[in-house]
Structure formats: C-alpha cells, structure tokens
UniProtKB/Swiss-Prot annotation:
The keyword Thylakoid does not apply. It is found in: Nucleus. One of its GO terms (molecular function) is DNA binding. Residues 173-186 have a biased composition (Basic and acidic residues). Residues 111-188, 368-400 are annotated as: Disordered. It comes from Oryza sativa subsp. japonica. This is B3 domain-containing protein Os03g0620500. InterPro entries: B3_DNA-bd, DNA-bd_pseudobarrel_sf, REM16-like. GO terms for cellular component: nucleus.
Length: 545
C-alpha cells in the first residue's frame, strides 16, 4: 500500500503521544476484530495490572451524543471479558471483522478510549486523538466514542472502556505487544475448538447435534462454570477395554488440570459416589491421560461408545483435584415396533398413516369409524432437531397449506415424531375446534422441554421458523386460553434456521404445570398490541380419553 510506512509512523506516534514511563504498566492496548468478535472482547491482563488486576463488574461506553452503553465484565478461561452489552456497542458503531480498536487510558479521568480503523489501515491521528472526554455518574470517567470516515478504506472512532483508577497512556510497543501476544478478540482464542459462546471446550473430533448443543448451552447457563466445561465424545478405546483410558486435550489439560501425575476425584452428576482414576502426564509432556480406575467409572455409570461426557472442573487448590461429570447419551432414532408400541401414527411425505406391528396400512374403518381417511390428512412434517433424536432433519420445500384437503386445519409436527392413535385424534379435534387462520405447530413435551432432566428448552423446527417467524433474536409473547396471563419469552435462532425459546420458557412451563407427554399447539396470532405472539393450547396427557 502506498504510503504505508508513513501511515504506520503516524500509528506509532499516536501511541507515543500517550507515553507514561512512571511505572511501565500498559496504558493502552490494540485489538483486531476476528471471527465472533461481536459477542465479546478480551481485556489484556497487563492492562488490568494498573488497576490491581481487577476491574468493576460493569463498564460504560459513552458515545459523542451522550449515549451510554453498559457492558458486563465477566471472567472466562482466566480472561477478563466484555460480554453482555458489547454486541450493542459494536452494532451502534458499525464495527466489522478485521477492524482494529486501540483502547487507551486517559490521564486524570479514569477513562479508556480507543481508535477504530477499517481493514487494519493506519489510524488517522488528526481525527482520533483529540480529547473529547466527559464526566459520568458513579465516580468513574469515560471517553466519548465517535465514528467517521475519511476514505473508502479507513474509518476512525474513539471508543471507551472503564477503568477504576487514575493513570495515563501506553507506549507504541505496549500497544503492539498487546496486539500480538494477546491478540484474541473473541472466544476463538488460539484454539479453533473453543466455542464461540463462552463456557465449554470441545475435544478434537467431538461434533454436537443441535439437540446436544442446546442442552449444553442450557447446562452452562444453569451452572455458570468458572472454568470452561470440557466436552468429549467417548470412543471405543475410552470405554470398551479393561485398559480403557481417556486422553485430555493438551491445551485444556495444561490450563486446568494438575501439572503433575496424580490421582484425581470424579463425581457423577446427581450421585454421591466418587471414583479415583489416575491422571498421568507423559514425560515428553505430549500426553495427558486418565486411566486406572477410569474403567470403574465407565462401567458403574454405563458409559457407552458415542456418549458425550462433560467435565465440570472445580477450582484446584493444589491438593485435591475434583471434577463432576455430566453425560449426554448417544441418541439413536426410535424404531417403534411390536414389543413397545403396537400402533402409532407417523408423518410420511406430508401425510399421516397408521403404523401397525406388521407395517401394514389400515383402512379408514380402523380409525374413527370411517369418518376420516388417515392417508389424506393434511399434516405436514417439520424438521425439528430438538425433537428428532439424532439431531438431523431432511431439508424440505416451502410448505403449501391446502385447507380443503382432509378433515382438519393444517398444522406442522416435527419430522419423525410419532403420534399414538389417541394423540392423533385429540390433535385433530383441537386443531379443528381452533379454526386458526394461521399455522399451528404441534410439539409433544419431553424431559428437556419441561425440566425433568434439569433443562428447560424447546425448539421450533426449521420450516415453520423460516416461513412464519422473523429473523434474529426476538421477544415473543405466549398466551394461554382462559387465563388472560401473558409470558414474555426470548426466542433466539439456532443452527439450521430453527428457533429456540430461552429466558421465560421455564416460567411458562412451571406456571402451566407442563409435564412430559403433554401436547402443546403453538398458534401464531396477529396481535398488534403485543407484537409477535403465540397462543398455546395444551392437551394434557392424563386428560386424553
């Protein structure tokens, strides 16, 4: 790039303008926004040294117009992270991947400001270093933030980060060091296996289905681990040999496991019993292995190949190393046969049919006295990874509802969901009585939906979501018939264009006393006063006749 040398000199001069040699502490730092930067940003530990290694729980970022962005500070993987609220700040300033931010601590004002540059172009000093600082309430001071552009390829902005004590700025070398040695700007860090959302680390070769990912996300929210969870899929060598062992990923073991070979303590979630496998570190420091009584842990808890073990580590005090293990069982698509359920309705190719033990079709006389033909009922199947055991659903064409076909209004169910004859009749009856102008989504409550296994998650499938639900995170109002009560539920996108209910869904479940095998009919309604809303019709499993 022409003039790159002179522009880089301006960049260095910008940093040197804030030099404070009194204590040699980092007074500013530089960050280049990498993948997933919009979710979080890490503050270098050296920058925190000037505040005694600590910073307040929240920081405020203030714009030139006086808009204040409150950002939560949290600890993950021994890193201090700007998280909740950071995304709003990023959006407001139109920060993009590969933009660079220079954060500085402003002398005598307890402020930290930053300069943004597009595509790592040098900073325009003249438009990014003037003192535009303000006093803020609460005893902390911040710099204002502004953005502008002087060319098609560069953009400058003054950003802010909270500081809790006085001080001044940094040298150009410090800014450069913070960019190179602590360049992680998001949870990608150095290892691509570290999840974009904080809370867990996947071992190499571990791939989560959407259902497992949702359960894992909910587990992280429930226990809020101080140390990221370690998630690994069981292989044959881990569970099927008298000499079974488990290798812990090196980057994780080095960071969180003991630094010497020793016996550790494992607990099974929900049990008081303890197991004491040996944690062994090879002399060449390339292998970190659980063995010995590891096989006892596997056998006593019936851990199988394909299961996913989640290690929740406790803070290591140097003497006893402890971890609690949660398990996600390998899920296999159900095969409904004569030994379990002799007669069920299945969704196939957009039609419903009755599945018998010999897999024969039945005539309409075998259903509701000949008043209905199951093979022509207008029910569409829907890919719903949360309901589908293996987390996979086939891609489907856009739905075409034709209310003239069959005896009921159209509705959607999860792909591979199986309704008993009793369930099918009850759903048909309720859908017919609702007379909805809009689509209805049918979901049979399982343990994860109603909190039986400690989780409260529910997913609406892809086809329903992409056709009828807005993109992005939304606040949804859930209503029930006859109560007049409303619940505000957060709905966020999942992989594969599905949608998941998060905050607020637990309250809905508890207030309505939902149980496994209850059926919920989600009716999308037009309610301008409440915005996006659904009326939920509940069919109790113990009330079906």
């Amino acid at each position: 790039m022409a003039g790159q040398g002179s522009q880089m000199k301006k960049y260095c001069d910008c940093c040197k303008r804030y030099v404070d040699h009194s204590n040699g502490k980092m007074k500013c730092f530089h960050r280049q926004m990498s993948a997933n930067f919009e979710h979080s940003m890490i503050i270098p530990n050296k920058f925190l040294d000037q505040f005694g290694g600590k910073i307040s729980r929240t920081v405020e970022l203030e714009s030139p117009k006086g808009n204040v962005y409150v950002v939560k500070v949290s600890k993950h993987m021994n890193k201090t992270v700007l998280q909740c609220g950071w995304e709003a700040f990023v959006d407001a300033h139109q920060i993009e991947e590969n933009d660079s931010l220079l954060f500085r601590h402003i002398k005598n004002s307890r402020r930290a400001s930053g300069v943004q540059e597009r595509n790592a172009d040098p900073i325009d000093v003249s438009s990014s270093t003037h003192d535009d600082t303000v006093q803020s309430s609460g005893g902390e001071r911040f710099a204002r933030s502004e953005s502008g552009s002087d060319s098609q390829h560069s953009k400058t902005a003054k950003l802010a980060a909270t500081c809790s004590s006085g001080g001044s700025e940094c040298t150009g070398e410090e800014a450069k060091e913070s960019s190179s040695s602590e360049h992680e700007s998001s949870y990608d860090l150095v290892d691509p296996q570290i999840a974009p959302m904080p809370g867990y680390v996947l071992s190499r070769g571990t791939n989560l289905s959407q259902a497992h990912e949702e359960k894992l996300d909910m587990l992280v929210q429930e226990i809020r681990p101080e140390i990221p969870l370690y998630v690994t899929t069981m292989k044959h060598s881990n569970v099927n040999s008298h000499h079974a062992s488990l290798v812990i990923a090196k980057h994780y073991a080095c960071a969180y496991f003991p630094h010497t070979s020793q016996t550790i303590t494992l607990k099974w979630h929900g049990k008081n019993r303890k197991w004491h496998p040996k944690f062994y570190i090879r002399k060449d420091q390339v292998g970190y292995i659980l063995h010995g009584r590891w096989i006892d842990f596997v056998r006593h808890n019936h851990v199988k190949e394909g299961d996913i073990c989640i290690f929740h580590l406790k803070n290591f005090n140097g003497r006893k190393f402890r971890a609690t293990v949660h398990l996600l069982r390998e899920t296999i698509p159900h095969s409904f046969g004569a030994l379990h359920i002799p007669k069920r309705f299945e969704s196939r190719n957009g039609r419903m049919r009755l599945k018998m033990t010999d897999d024969r079709r039945v005539s309409s006389t075998e259903c509701r006295r000949g008043t209905m033909e199951p093979s022509t009922t207008n029910v569409k199947k829907e890919a719903d990874n949360e309901q589908c055991n293996n987390g996979q659903g086939k891609r489907q064409e856009p739905l075409n509802f034709d209310v003239s076909v069959g005896s009921s209004k159209p509705y959607l169910t999860a792909d591979r969901v199986s309704l008993t004859e009793e369930q099918f009749m009850k759903v048909e009856e309720n859908v017919h009585s609702i007379q909805s102008e809009g689509p209805i989504y049918v979901s049979i409550m399982n343990k994860s939906n109603v909190g039986t296994d400690g989780l409260y998650i529910i997913t609406l499938g892809r086809q329903f979501a992409i056709r009828y639900l807005p993109e992005g995170e939304q606040t949804l109002t859930l209503l029930t018939t006859g109560t007049g009560k409303a619940w505000q539920v957060k709905m966020r996108p999942r992989s594969g264009d599905a949608r998941m209910f998060t905050l607020g869904w637990r309250d809905f479940v508890r207030d309505n006393r939902l149980q496994t095998e209850d059926i919920c009919l989600f009716q999308l309604t037009k309610n301008s006063e409440r915005g996006l809303a659904m009326k939920v019709h509940i069919i109790r499993h113990n009330e079906r006749s």
